[in-house]
Amino acid sequence: MVKRNLKGRGDKLSANAPLDNQLEAGKVAKQRDELREKQKRKREDSQTDEFVPDSLSSKILNEARKQLLEEALERQETESATSSVPKRQRGAWLGADASGDKSDDDDDDNEEEDDNGFEDQVVELDPRDEADLARFLKKDAIQMSTLYDIIQAKIEAKQNDAELALSQVDPNEFNMRDMDPEVVEMYEQIGQYMSKYRSGKVPKAFKIIPKMINWEQILFLTKPETWTAAAMYQATRLFASNMNPKMCQRFYTLVLLPRLRDDIDEFKKLNYHLYQALCKAIYKPAAFFKGLILPLLESGTCTLREAVIFSSVLTKVPIPIFHSAAAMLRIAEMEYTGANSVFLRALIDKKYALPYRAVDGVVNHFIRLKTDERDMPVLWHQCLLALCQRYKNDLNAEQKAAIYELIRFHGHYLISPEIRRELESKETEDGHVITSVVVEGRKTDSMEF
């Protein structure tokens, strides 16, 4: 038996009719359900019949009119009490009383009158009233500030505190501060790591040392004397690029210079990584001369081996002219040692166009040794020869005469004739070159770093 499908929800099941009746029913359209038609008409009638009766609408309008009148009276009383200036009153228009025989068109007209009845209100205050009101206001009222103002004020306060702290820091003083035991332990562990360092990344905590106020205290917690040569190279790179010249000079004098001298003294040569650190140190020329070269010479214990190794960096790396001139002048004013001649010759051979004061200072360095009874070493004669070869055109007649007199007292059987030949050589107009210069806008009298 075939299963019969229902046509829709709520279909009634009917018994099977005879075949002839089914055929007749299929020819004629099925009539719609009378019950559904009745329900639909009832819903439509209920929707169309929903309206407010005339009696109820009149009551609503009367109540609304009373409320508006009460509000208008209250507003008028308050305005008359607070201000002596008469103000225009708002009009509340609801039209005449609504009656049962009025149509909906009359109600629409009344609504338009309600909208047009309210006019803009212009308020004028008497200056005396304003003055009286101002007397009751707080004179020290707190000004409202936005979130941006609060954050900006905090940022400026932090910046001012940081600038004040940095301005009070003396680079020549060792800043001691109380430190957290955990911080001390961390940097001691970093020191152990640097004592075994060969290659790779440096700890981030070590990289921030140059930015700290008490950087010297933290640095010595890592025990720099135990660092490997590769660690010293990385530290020199870091400090030379992130510190100002004064702080960098302290690092060179306290950490780098002792390590370089110890390595040369122990192994009679300089480790490759330490030599690279020495080359990187010249990134700050003023700190290089004032933190390495000048302290080395002023110590009085600089050996020729150390002088040759340190001066070799000067011949390989370009140096600013005025830093070179200032260094030459400072070295020339020192008490003579063999190491002084090594550094002076290295700077002279760079063939820089030096200021006249630097050239005069080097010449006076040689002339004042005329009365010295010691036999001058070959390094001294070679340095004097280099000076005459490079800057003979900048020497005046008095200086040349003084040099002639000097080589009579301190002569060398091979070098002194060469010095005399350089001074006596005739300069043609084509070959004459003036090497010393005067820089516009800068005083050459003050030879400072």
Swiss-Prot record:
Composition bias, Basic and acidic residues: 30-46
UniProt GO cellular component terms: cytoplasm; nucleolus; preribosome, small subunit precursor
Comp. bias regions, Acidic residues: 103-124
InterPro entries: Bystin
One record GO biological process: rRNA processing
Signal peptide per UniProt: none
Residues covered by region (Disordered): 1-58, 71-125
A Pfam cross-reference name: Bystin
Gene Ontology molecular function: any one: snoRNA binding
Transmembrane segments: none
Family per similarity comment: Belongs to the bystin family.
Protein known as: Uncharacterized protein byn-1
Organism this protein belongs to: Caenorhabditis elegans
